[in-house]
């Protein structure tokens, strides 16, 4: 009797599990509104790794010895839906000899694959043509085109023993990434850059990167704009290198005091990441268009831990050259990370303008002056 009851209980449990969501085939990440990214670095301002302060002044980050563009010709394979994609194409041993070349950045519809669609306010896939009715977060499966991208690259010798980051500036609309056959992560969001630390995935000599790109994803429901609906890698792909203790992020505040709109109010916050055996410091210099230093300071990074937030004391700078549309005056900010001996280990920076915007007496003002909008 007990054995028969036990068998009935197990049979019932099996039936329940068979129809439970856990037993059902899981939806892929590109069909989920929660899978917006995996293993990505935190968003931050652009921290271009220049070699010298002179390079910062010139502002041409693409000429930095610590920047490597992956734009250009990639091997490419296009299919009508996910079931037809080459599932193991990311493996270095996979043969791509019969694949075509495609230019990156560039949408695949503009290079002979699929069809570009223009709509203004509706979802392009919510149409009889695709036999699909909008059901967020799901998108069509049978017509969800997939592009498989591959290319090789070599890391400069000067990057040895440094950190290496991969950045994809914009890929429509969902993609997985592999380096040397090793899974890196994924991203969902066509117009947002995504970065991954790939230092431990690199090899000496030639390396291989692979992207599997899906035309539509759950994120496509948030990208319904008055525009052409296109697919693929449409913005820059590149690598950059930093020391293992590096400037991860910084924030500049630069406005005018509102009494006479003459003096500048300057603030700077910097985030340093990466463990260090030794002490270090972070220094900034702010120079005007003639190269004169208007402010400078250096603060020790007391902690040797993984993350340090440094807030420089705010400063009031007398009689700055304000930024406006008529007179777009700019200053140059230099940031230098130093080791315990005072040696500069990383240099970055940006242009800075002093400007204040406000509603004053019912009018929109820039630097205290009303403008027409």
Protein language model regions, located:
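Bacterial Sec-dependent N-terminal signal peptides
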Residues: 1-26
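N-terminal pre-domain segments of enzymes
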Residues: 25-69, 73-75, 82
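N-terminal carbohydrate-binding accessory modules
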Residues: 251, 334-373
């Amino acid at each position: 009797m007990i054995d028969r009851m036990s068998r009935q209980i197990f049979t019932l449990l099996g039936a329940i599990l068979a129809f439970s969501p856990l037993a059902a085939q899981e939806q892929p990440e590109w069909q989920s509104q929660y899978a917006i990214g995996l293993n990505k670095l935190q968003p931050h301002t652009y921290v271009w790794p220049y070699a010298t302060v002179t390079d910062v002044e010139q502002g041409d980050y693409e000429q930095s010895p610590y920047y490597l563009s992956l734009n250009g010709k990639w091997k490419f394979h296009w299919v009508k839906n996910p079931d037809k994609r080459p599932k193991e194409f990311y493996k270095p041993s996979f043969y791509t000899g019969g694949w075509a070349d495609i230019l990156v950045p560039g949408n695949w519809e503009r290079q002979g694959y699929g069809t570009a669609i223009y709509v203004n306010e509706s979802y392009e896939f919510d149409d009889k043509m695709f036999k699909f009715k909008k059901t967020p977060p799901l998108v069509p499966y049978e017509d969800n085109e997939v592009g498989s991208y591959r290319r090789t690259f070599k890391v400069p010798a000067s990057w040895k023993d440094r950190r290496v980051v991969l950045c994809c500036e914009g890929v429509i609309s969902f993609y997985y990434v592999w380096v040397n056959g090793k899974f890196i992560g994924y991203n969902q969001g066509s117009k947002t850059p995504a970065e991954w630390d790939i230092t431990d995935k690199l090899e000496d000599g030639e390396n291989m990167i692979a992207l599997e790109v899906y035309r539509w994803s759950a994120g496509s429901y948030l990208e319904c704009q008055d525009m052409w609906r296109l697919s693929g890698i449409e913005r820059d792909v590149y690598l950059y290198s930093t020391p293992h203790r590096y400037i991860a992020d910084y924030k500049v505040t630069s406005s005018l005091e509102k009494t006479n709109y003459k003096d500048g109010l300057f603030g700077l916050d910097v985030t340093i990441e990466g463990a260090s055996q030794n002490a270090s410091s972070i220094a900034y210099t702010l120079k005007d268009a003639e190269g004169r230093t208007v402010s400078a300071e250096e603060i020790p990074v007391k902690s040797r831990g993984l993350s340090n937030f440094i807030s420089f004391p705010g400063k009031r700078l007398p009689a700055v050259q304000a930024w406006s549309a008529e007179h777009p005056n700019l200053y140059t900010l230099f940031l230098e990370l130093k080791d315990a001996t005072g040696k500069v280990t990383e240099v970055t920076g940006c242009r800075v303008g002093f400007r204040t915007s406000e509603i004053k007496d019912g009018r929109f003002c820039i630097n205290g002056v009303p403008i027409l909008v």
